[in-house]
Amino acid sequence: MKALSKSRFKQGLECPNKLYFSNNKEVYHNVKNNDPFLQALASGGFQVEEYARLQYPGGVLIEDPQDRKIYDYQDLADQTSELLKQENVVIYEAAFYVDDLFIRTDVLVKKGTHIQLIEVKAKSLDPSEPYNFVGKSKKIVSSWKPYLF
């Protein structure tokens, strides 16, 4: 089974066939997997994720033990389920099974019966552009609104 990541979710929105075939590397081979630039971008994404965790301190990280040879999806979902029994909790990398899909969210904040899911994205910008965040009208540029909370 392959997890439904943000990248795969976006891929499915662009083209459901790509999502379907992404499980079969012989049929659909991603030539960008070994691209050093894309690997550096992914590393930047991890940094942004760590920064987001600082915004929600005291959380519990759901992770698979490093000594396992395979990823135990059910164990990760069970850890999340156990933590959600608490009245209030912050969970990093919360894991769920929904209709045979394995899903993770960057940050989950539970306060009583209210649950907030926070997904973090990294976005590059051109530092020479004078209106990256705020436009000439002194308002936030609309293309940045999905990235700000």
Residue ranges of model-derived segments:
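A general structural signal for short secondary-structure junctions and capping/turn motifs
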Residues: 1-2, 10-12, 81-83, 97-99, ...
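Charged, glycine-rich intrinsically disordered N-terminal tails and low-complexity linkers that flank
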Residues: 1-60
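Generic alpha-helix structural propensity
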Residues: 4, 43, 47-51, 75, ...
